[in-house]
Design a protein with these regions (language model features):
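Hydrophobic transmembrane alpha-helices and their immediate loop junctions
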Residues: 1-203
Length: 203
């Protein structure tokens, strides 16, 4: 299993280090690792083979072999593993007072609020897709959800632009997510070909 940091983290961490010092840097990075550990535990509990983990500004991304072949329940638990871990860390910060506990609380709340948005590729979107997509129309369900996610992000970016410069970091994150979805949307036809080949091999 490979572990890597996405290059987009560098400017984010530089900005955090300049604005909040090394403490903010450490809390954010530690929180993202803990969040991703929740996904990893969920993947292992459901016997999923994790090929790699990439840490991103909003959490992380697990590359899982044959992800779509797992049950709806397994994919739902995988999506919720990170938010559950973040919620546990939030509860600890709320009940145990320690230096920086308020900063930990704020960061966990931000990670939760962002990750539970009902759009791809965030955890909220992954969970909703796992609940609603149908095996016989998976390609069309995912395409519709991708288009919804792109539209949601475009509207969100337009709203956030009115709050510059305070919203610069959120705008950067929204643009990154939008570009991710556009990239997936462009290559979705190859996923359809793969699913058709797999279906033909089973019949």
């Amino acid at each position: 299993m490979k572990f890597r940091l996405h290059p987009i983290l560098l400017p984010v961490f530089i900005l955090l280090a300049v604005m909040g010092g090394l403490a903010a840097y450490a809390i954010v990075f530690g929180s993202l690792l803990f969040h991703e550990a929740g996904h990893l535990v969920a993947a292992k509990a459901n016997r999923m083979r994790v090929r790699s983990i990439t840490i991103l500004p909003y959490g992380g991304e697990l590359e899982i072999a044959g992800r779509a072949d797992h049950s709806r329940r397994a994919r739902l638990l995988l999506a919720l593993g990170g938010p559950i871990a973040t919620t546990l860390l939030l509860l600890v910060a709320m009940t145990v007072t320690f230096p920086g506990s308020m900063d930990v609380m704020r960061i966990q709340l931000l990670i939760l609020l962002v990750n539970l948005l009902p759009i791809l590729p965030l955890d909220g979107g992954q969970a909703l897709l796992a609940l609603t997509e149908r095996e016989e129309s998976r390609y069309f369900d995912q395409t519709a959800f991708l288009l919804f996610s792109i539209g949601f992000l475009v509207v969100g970016i337009s709203v956030l632009l009115t709050g510059l410069p305070e919203t610069a970091l959120l705008i950067s994150l929204a643009v990154f997510l939008c570009l991710q979805n556009i990239s997936v949307f462009r290559f979705r036809r190859y996923q359809r070909i793969y699913e058709q080949l797999k279906r033909n091999n089973l019949t």
